[in-house]
């Protein structure tokens, strides 16, 4: 099982990623060892998650979300 996640960074930007172990991945981000993008924008908050049965489906959905406009991402997060 993979989790797609969106986090809101300190500058109010949104970062989308996937993880097999979400809790572990969030700790990595918080410790500044995750993506360079998030590292430069700490602290952050988790605002959205989706579960996917495998990496392939999670990656496909991640790419769909990354192509969305900011407004569509905000709507997804609210709903």
Briefly describe each language-model feature range.
Residues 1-52, 56-66, 70-79:
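GIY-YIG nuclease catalytic motif and its immediate N-terminal context
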């Amino acid at each position: 099982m993979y989790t797609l996640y969106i986090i809101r960074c300190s500058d109010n930007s949104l970062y989308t990623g996937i993880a097999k172990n979400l809790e572990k991945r969030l700790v990595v981000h918080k410790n500044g060892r995750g993506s360079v993008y998030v590292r430069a924008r700490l602290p952050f908050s988790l605002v959205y998650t989706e579960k996917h049965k495998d990496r392939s489906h999670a990656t496909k959905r991640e790419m769909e979300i990354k192509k969305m406009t900011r407004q569509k991402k905000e709507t997804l997060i609210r709903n």
